[in-house]
Amino acid sequence: FPVWGWVLMAVLLIGGFIAYKAVKGDKKSAWTTKKLSMGAICIALSSVLSMIRLWKMPMGGSITPASMLPLMLFAYVYGTGSGCTLGVIYGVLQFILDGGDAAAYGVTALLLDYPIAFAMMGLAGAFRSMKNENVGLALGVVLACFGRYLASFVSGWVFYGSYASYYGFVSPVVYSICYNGAYMLPECIICVLLAMLMGNRLVKSLKQNAK
């Protein structure tokens, strides 16, 4: 799937959200053209990075070269609410690109695995008021990763718990904790390290483009 296709779909989805807010008269959304463009770019970057899988789990989930970081950077610059919105849109796109397999487990599983899980990327903006941007971003990354982990844990426990015995686990809870932790922990570490090393420069670049 070409990069321009991801950008186009992102723009269409964000545009639809803006139109919906405009009809409702919600002036707080403030999705400017620059913000829309930056959101589309971040979604495209995350989508491309998500295709580079360093390790793929058998039942979904993978370790990538920080595919969530562009979404987290957007949340850190534009705020938690905007970050959550972008995460939901990205989650819908990921569901489409993954072929819609999660739909076989029901709507709730689909929501937990995609829109809700990636909406947690918005939590990366929780510490944006800190003076030290590297630390603030790193803390936000940890919180966002934990939020996504919780969504995946609940989904794995409730909807995929029947696979526990297949992988040698007695308890579906322990199975979900271990399974989702196996890819989320390394993914989080990669994102935190990059945030600590390059976060300050990346945030400044995004803020300059946002002006």
Model-derived segments and their meaning:
Residues 1-211:
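Loop-helix junctions at membrane interfaces
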